[in-house]
Amino acid sequence: MTGNVEYDVRRMFRHACAFTDCAIFCQKAPNSIVVRTQWYTIPEIVNSAFACEVFIKSLLLHHGMTLEEIRKKNHGLKGLWKAFRETDATSAARVEYDVTQPFNSQNPDFCDNMLDIMSEAFKEWRYIYEGHGACINMNFLIIFRNRLRSFCCESYYQMTWSEYESRGHASCDSDTN
């Protein structure tokens, strides 16, 4: 990290976008492979969960939390999201509203319940072969990841994800890291 908050959050944003790209590749790749020897759902989950983590951590940094404070949060999405909600309740509520709409849930705790289930997805699914069980709602994970990406893009670049994507990050940033 450079200590330049704007630079660092944008760099974190691009890194999270790269993990999102990897997750999307894992989702789409099996359709183009004739003889498959791997199941790509697990890498899709791991990359999506890690992208969510980095998106949220970039938001925390953007809102004034120090790197030391962020590091103490570890990987848990529930705790990270709770910290963001405490920092910017209005934006968090907007993201939660957008994420829960496709599910048409009347449960006011729907988002929290989903985050409870997937909070440790990065750690749990990364080592799923060790034999412990894990559960996740893929639709929620994907919608949450994509909404975080859009929200971060709006926050850091004042443009929609579609606008950012069509311009390419090279024209939005002075660096390419």
Predicted segments with their positions:
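Long, charged low-complexity segments
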Residues: 1-13, 65-177
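Charged alpha-helical initiation segments
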Residues: 1-46, 59-66, 168-177
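Structural signal for well-ordered, non-membrane alpha-helices
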Residues: 20, 24, 52, 149-156
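Residue-level detector of short, conserved catalytic/binding motifs and their immediate flanks
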Residues: 42, 52, 123
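Conserved beta-strand->loop/alpha-helix structural units within folded catalytic cores of enzymes
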Residues: 48-57
